[in-house]
Design a protein with these regions (language model features):
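Cysteine-centered catalytic environments shared across enzyme families
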Residues: 1-209, 214-215
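Charged, low-complexity surface segments at secondary-structure and domain boundaries
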Residues: 18-20, 124-130, 279-285, 313-314, ...
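Polar low-complexity intrinsically disordered regions enriched in Ser/Thr and small residues
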Residues: 55, 105, 115, 349-350, ...
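ATP-dependent adenylate-handling active sites, centered on carboxylate activation for C-N bond formation
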Residues: 134-354, 370-372, 376-382, 393-412
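Short, surface-exposed acidic
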Residues: 355-367
């Protein structure tokens, strides 16, 4: 595999809907570029993710029509379990879409997979390199981040806003987009709004606050559940703040929302990777192994986040999931991922070139807690008779809102 630092990222974005397999239909990268990645089996060819249909995909010794999804699942792609492929040369695959609501019975294509008329095959897998020496590993992250920031600063960004929580991830993304307004969502008094205000002042940035109310939650819960196909409390607690930020940015006329997704997984941002040998939440007993477990969760998480953002009318842009940063992160030794004193060590060091020291060092709460969304959905559930003594009281409340929303839709 050639050096990802030599591959400028293809910062393409957009949404496609499947159905007709007559032409190439790809999101995230040009067809010829993806064909090259298929032919080379290169998992990190220099994109921020791709998915879709290729009329002629180079598979083994020939070419076939195929559906593809990148190795980290950064672009979702769904197939319909209930529709059999057609019989013509250009209609030999199941019905598919980047939006699960287009399909009667959607199932995600696995990350890194290729689906041909004959089979679904794992095609790409993430590299598993040995850890590099600390100085070389840090230099690689520095170079990769410099390339990503440089590409963003050189690209047209008048249609981009930034989801901004005041931490190092969103701080670096905002620094790469110096003219973009920053948006933060949360309930009054929450951690994320306070941190975003402090960071925006330090960076001299325009901050727009989306103050969430209980009415917003009652409206957003069924909307996000319908868009993502998920009703569990954890997924909705995470996706709803993103959805509400995206709605606000879209209402202000922005087409894209830049997010910091992926940094915690790639760079050791979770507490469970610090001392994994004594942490029941991971199976690995090394920092690198625990980090790899969190990276493996990205495809499922990104399906939720990308679909929720698109449901709000905006296209996500996730520069910290650029192949160059992914490749550099995978070579980090454990000491540059997480220690008892600091998490995301290498990323914070690299970010110091772009953000104030306080932003580079800032602690970040998980979005569901930092915005108070998890707390307030629980409060709403209890106010509506779903007490904590009940099994899955929040899930039952979510189901009740979704049923009410469906009944309202049917009555129109």
């Amino acid at each position: 595999m050639s050096d990802p630092e030599d591959k400028p990222s293809r910062l393409h974005a957009g949404r496609i809907d499947g159905g007709s397999n007559d032409d190439n239909g790809l999101i995230g990268a040009p067809a010829d570029f993806v064909r090259g990645a298929l032919a080379d089996r290169d998992p990190l060819p220099g994109t921020t993710g791709f998915a879709g249909f290729l009329a002629e995909a180079p598979i083994d010794d020939g070419t076939e029509p195929a559906l593809v999804r990148d190795v980290l699942g950064r672009q979702p792609l769904f197939i319909d379990r209930g529709v059999e492929p057609g019989g013509t040369a250009n209609d030999r695959l199941p019905r598919w879409s980047t939006d699960p609501t287009d399909l009667a019975d959607p199932k995600p294509l696995p990350a890194g997979a290729v689906l041909t008329p004959g089979a679904t095959m794992p095609w790409w897998s993430l590299p598993s390199p040995e850890p590099a020496a600390p100085s070389a590993a840090q230099a690689a992250v520095d170079r990769a981040l410099r390339g990503v920031v440089g590409d963003l600063r050189a690209s047209p960004t008048d249609d981009v806003a930034v989801a901004f929580s005041g931490g190092v991830d969103s701080g670096v993304v905002a620094a790469a987009l110096p003219r973009a307004p920053c948006y933060v969502a949360g309930f009054e008094g929450c951690h994320d709004i306070a941190a975003a205000r402090e960071a925006a002042a330090a960076m001299d940035r325009d901050l727009r606050i989306v103050e969430i109310t209980h009415d917003d939650l009652r409206r957003a819960i069924p909307a996000v559940a319908a868009a993502t196909g998920r009703r569990n409390a954890m997924d909705l607690n995470i996706a709803i703040p993103l959805f509400l930020v995206a709605e606000a940015a879209a209402a202000d006329g922005f087409d894209r929302l830049a997010v910091g997704q992926g940094a915690d997984e790639l760079f050791g941002g979770y507490s469970k990777v610090v001392e994994p040998a004594t942490d029941h939440r991971v199976e690995a007993d090394t920092v690198r192994g625990a980090r790899d477990e969190t990276v493996a969760t990205l495809p499922v998480q990104l399906e939720r986040d990308v679909v929720a953002l698109r449901a709000a009318g905006i296209e996500p842009l996730a520069p910290l999931l650029d192949d160059r940063l992914v490749a550099a992160a995978l070579e980090l030794p454990g000491e540059l991922l997480a220690t008892p004193a600091e998490r995301k060590v290498a990323l914070r060091c690299a970010a110091a070139e772009y953000v104030p020291a306080g932003v580079a060092a800032a602690d970040k709460k998980a979005v569901q807690y930092g915005t108070y969304v998890s707390r307030e959905i629980d409060r709403l559930a209890r106010r509506n008779g779903f007490k904590r003594r009940m099994d899955d009281h929040v899930g039952r409340y979510i189901d009740s809102l979704c049923r009410e929303s469906m009944m309202d839709d049917h009555s129109l």
